[in-house]
């Protein structure tokens, strides 16, 4: 490919004055697929579909608000001067870690209100969340955001990427590292790992699937974040997501080890035990 063409149109559909962005379409598609998978996983673990749907109805708005709030806080120098853009979430600018914090709070409160084991629900959610993250990164691709440092055309061609993807990585007068793609692939590999190992019920105690997800995602995010040029910064020195990734990686592994040795009441998963666990806690 020798000719640089125009970037892909971020608008999927125009209905009069209404514009439907690809970013929103991709995120919405990721949510729909994740919900369907969560319901199936919930039934396998003995959690009623109604409980899954109710939790998601609460979690979605709070997740979105938390993800946007997190982003705005660390970009406050800009949004303080442009407050009208705070709500323009369709232009991009949501932080995954912020969304995970918001979703985690909702899950904990919801499970306590329904007497459902929190770790069980987090285990159900983990594969669906990382799959949604992997799909959602393509929204960043359409918006030409979450890209990396300047690279060469020959490097991108050496990755055997299609021309349309390479062309979209021509941003601000230079080709960029497709960090969105690296993270998307990492997330989908994590999804495959969790889906394959979740059947190994003798490996996991409740919460281990979720903690494995946290460690996996944090490990990959640390490296992809180091290649990005649009990182949220703390004191203009520390990449917020890298610092948080270190804490989450070591924290999740440490917590998994601690719970195995110091929390004997934490259940091992046994084949067919999901319904029994939920019933006992209700």
Swiss-Prot record:
It comes from Lactiplantibacillus plantarum (strain ATCC BAA-793 / NCIMB 8826 / WCFS1) (Lactobacillus plantarum). Its EC number is 2.5.1.145. The chain crosses the membrane at residues 18-38, 56-76, 89-109, 237-257. Pfam families: LGT (PF01790). PANTHER family: PHOSPHATIDYLGLYCEROL--PROLIPOPROTEIN DIACYLGLYCERYL TRANSFERASE, PROLIPOPROTEIN DIACYLGLYCERYL TRANSFERASE. The gene is lgt. One of its GO terms (biological process) is lipoprotein biosynthetic process. The keyword Cell membrane applies. Pathway: Protein modification; lipoprotein biosynthesis (diacylglyceryl transfer). The lineage of its organism: Bacteria, Bacillati, Bacillota, Bacilli, Lactobacillales. This is Phosphatidylglycerol--prolipoprotein diacylglyceryl transferase.
């Amino acid at each position: 490919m020798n000719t640089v063409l125009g970037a892909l149109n971020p608008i999927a559909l125009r209905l009069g004055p209404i514009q439907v962005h690809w970013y929103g379409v991709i995120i919405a598609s990721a949510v729909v697929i994740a919900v369907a998978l969560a319901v199936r996983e919930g039934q396998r673990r003995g959690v009623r579909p109604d409980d899954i749907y109710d939790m998601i109805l609460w979690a979605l708005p709070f997740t979105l608000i938390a993800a946007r709030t997190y982003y705005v806080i660390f970009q406050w120098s800009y949004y303080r001067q442009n407050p009208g853009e705070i709500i323009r979430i369709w232009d991009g600018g949501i932080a995954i870690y912020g969304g995970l914090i918001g979703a985690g709070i909702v899950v904990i409160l919801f499970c306590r209100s329904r007497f459902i084991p929190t770790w069980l629900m987090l285990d159900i959610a983990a594969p669906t969340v990382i799959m949604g993250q992997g799909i959602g990164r393509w929204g960043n691709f359409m918006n030409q955001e979450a890209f990396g440092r300047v690279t060469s055309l020959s490097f991108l061609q050496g990755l055997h990427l299609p021309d349309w993807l390479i062309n979209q990585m021509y941003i601000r007068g230079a080709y960029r590292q497709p960090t969105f793609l690296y993270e998307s692939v990492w997330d989908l590999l994590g999804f495959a790992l969790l889906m394959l190992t979740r059947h190994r019920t003798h490996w996991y105690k409740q919460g281990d699937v979720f903690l494995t997800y946290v460690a996996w995602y944090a490990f990959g995010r640390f490296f992809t974040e180091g290649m990005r040029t649009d990182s949220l910064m703390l004191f203009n020195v520390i990449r917020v997501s890298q610092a948080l990734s270190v804490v989450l990686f070591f924290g999740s592994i440490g917590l998994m080890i601690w719970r195995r040795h110091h929390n004997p009441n934490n259940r091992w998963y046994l084949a067919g035990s999901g319904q029994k666990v939920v019933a006992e806690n209700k």
